[in-house]
Amino acid sequence: MQLIEGKLQLQGNERIAIVISRFNHIITDRLQEGAIDCFKRHGGNEKLLNLVLVPGAYELPLILDKLLESKKYDGVCVLGAIIRGGTPHFDYVSAEATKGIANTMLKYSMPVSFGVLTTDNIEQAIERAGSKAGNRGFEAMSTLIELLSLCQTLKG
């Protein structure tokens, strides 16, 4: 039996984009910091890293599609924060953003990591953006790095 897995180390020549929702920026700014920290710690070249800001989580799939279609990037880390409110808006936005991101990744067969928080309240979002529950932005970039390595290994 052969075990095939990715490594948590960049070569330094990977072109990466981080797409970030500005809505709930108090949370997404921290996710962005975590993702950039992970990128640097694991050998990323900051000259090859681009940050792309979008208005909200609903717009993430469209801009992800444009980035992957451009073929300028080896992978994309998608970050956002959708916090439940008093209306069904949360359910619609979180479902469509999630489906759109997954469908776009499969459409282009390119590494994409999902760092979009979907929380019931602001406290849960804060916990996942760098306090008690770690930083999901860091984790999303870590996932992307490993996925890039694994895809490269499987490519041959």
UniProtKB/Swiss-Prot annotation:
Active-site positions on this chain: H89 (proton donor)
Which pathway or pathways does this protein act in?
A: Cofactor biosynthesis; riboflavin biosynthesis; riboflavin from 2-hydroxy-3-oxobutyl phosphate and 5-amino-6-(D-ribitylamino)uracil: step 1/2
Where on this chain does 5-amino-6-(D-ribitylamino)uracil bind?
A: F23, A57, Y58, E59, A81, I82, I83, F114
Which enzyme type, at the first EC level?
transferase
Q: Which GO terms describe its cellular component?
A: cytosol; riboflavin synthase complex
The alphabetized UniProt keywords are: Riboflavin biosynthesis, Transferase
Briefly, what is this protein's role? Catalyzes the formation of 6,7-dimethyl-8-ribityllumazine by condensation of 5-amino-6-(D-ribitylamino)uracil with 3,4-dihydroxy-2-butanone 4-phosphate. This is the penultimate step in the biosynthesis of riboflavin.
Q: Which family does it belong to?
A: Belongs to the DMRL synthase family.
Q: What is this protein called?
A: 6,7-dimethyl-8-ribityllumazine synthase
